[in-house]
Regions:
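A conserved acidic beta->alpha catalytic loop
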Residues: 17-26, 46, 70
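Conserved nucleotide-sugar donor-binding catalytic segment
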Residues: 120-217
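Acidic helix N-cap motif at the loop->helix transition within catalytic regions
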Residues: 22-30, 74, 78
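Short, acidic, metal-binding catalytic loop of nucleotide-sugar glycosyltransferases
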Residues: 1-10
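Short aromatic/hydrophobic "clamp" motif used to bind/position activated sugar donors
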Residues: 66
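Conserved donor NDP-sugar-binding/catalytic core segment of glycosyltransferases
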Residues: 78-111
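C-terminal subregions of glycosyltransferases and related glycan-biosynthesis enzymes
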Residues: 180-188, 193-302
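Glycine-rich, basic loop-to-helix element that forms the pyrophosphate-binding segment
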Residues: 44-61
């Protein structure tokens, strides 16, 4: 419904069925029988995860730009129009994102959101030159061919099985790879406006925080290696060279992140004792993490 409500409809709609078993394919077909529109449905023979699906689209599509919308994304009506007009207005732009707000499983607004990214090319150049990771919410429009030229979504060099590390911070990896092209005057910016809402599920209290921290370290290391003209390391090689002390520090930071997430949902549900307990656990595990979240998220509450 969010796609059908877009003010700009001149785009090719490609739907990827990652071997779903919940009747999603029939739901899609039934929806478009009732709401006629161009669409292409690609069904994968096996479930390979988020990043593999994105890589398939990058290689399968023929359009200049791509914009992914996942199951828990709720684009506002002007998302496609505003992002497309922005990126197509300046040949220097590689990708354009926006701000994102949070909602619960019933569509009720939650505090916080994703308000990241540079709003000007000059700001982006400064960040890219300093070898900073490029954080931007994943519901963004980007140049498909240029993304592939820097490696696209990476699916090789990861251990088999779960967790699928390639599915963690996959957008961060792509934006950071594309940022290497700042030396050619290319840039990644955001439209400083909430154009998408993201559904956060109350029961999803756990997340692979340790895995995400490892991936961020991996992405940062490869950024520095690329800028020095060195070969990148696979995630398998990166993980193997970590020292025990370093892993313990990352585990404490992951514990802080998980505890703070649980505390938020417990307090919101009125479970005061459980919420306070997890809040103190988060602060004890890594006080710097708690302060950083307050600085970059809670202070943005309207």
């Amino acid at each position: 419904a969010c796609i059908m409500a877009q003010t700009m409809q001149d785009f090719h709609l490609l739907i990827v069925n990652d071997c779903s078993t919940d009747g999603s394919v029939e739901c899609v077909k039934r929806f478009f029988r009732q709401n006629p529109r161009q669409y292409e449905l690609v069904s994968l023979p096996e479930n390979r995860g988020l990043c593999a699906g994105r890589r398939l689209v990058e290689e399968h599509a023929t359009t200049k730009y791509l914009l992914f919308v996942d199951a828990d994304d709720c684009p506002l009506p002007t998302l496609v129009e505003k992002l497309y007009h922005k990126i197509s207005s300046d040949s220097d732009l590689l990708a354009v994102g926006c701000y994102q707000s949070f909602m619960d499983s019933k569509g009720k607004d939650l505090t916080g959101g994703i308000f990241l990214g540079e709003t000007s090319k000059e700001g982006f150049y400064e960040k890219a030159k300093k070898e900073k990771l490029i954080f931007m919410q994943p519901t963004a429009i980007y140049d498909r061919a240029i993304a592939l030229s820097v490696g696209g979504h990476q699916i090789e060099g990861f251990p088999l099985g779960k967790p699928r590390y390639q599915d963690l911070c996959e957008d961060l990896d792509l934006w950071t790879r594309m940022s290497d092209l700042y030396i050619q005057g290319k840039a990644i910016v955001v439209v400083p406006e909430v154009l998408c809402r993201y559904r956060k599920h109350e029961k999803a209290l756990s997340a692979n925080s340790l895995g995400m921290l490892l991936r961020m370290r991996h992405i940062k290391m490869n950024l520095k290696r690329r800028r020095k003209g060195l070969d990148e390391w696979s995630f398998i090689d990166f993980r193997a060279q970590l020292y025990t002390e370093e892993m313990r520090r990352l585990e404490k930071e992951a514990c802080a992140a998980d505890a703070l997430r649980r505390a938020y949902y417990h307090l919101r549900a009125g479970h005061i004792i459980a919420g306070v307990k997890d809040l103190f656990l988060s602060i004890k595990s890594n006080p710097h993490y708690f302060v950083d979240k307050v600085k970059h998220n809670l202070l943005r509450m309207k």
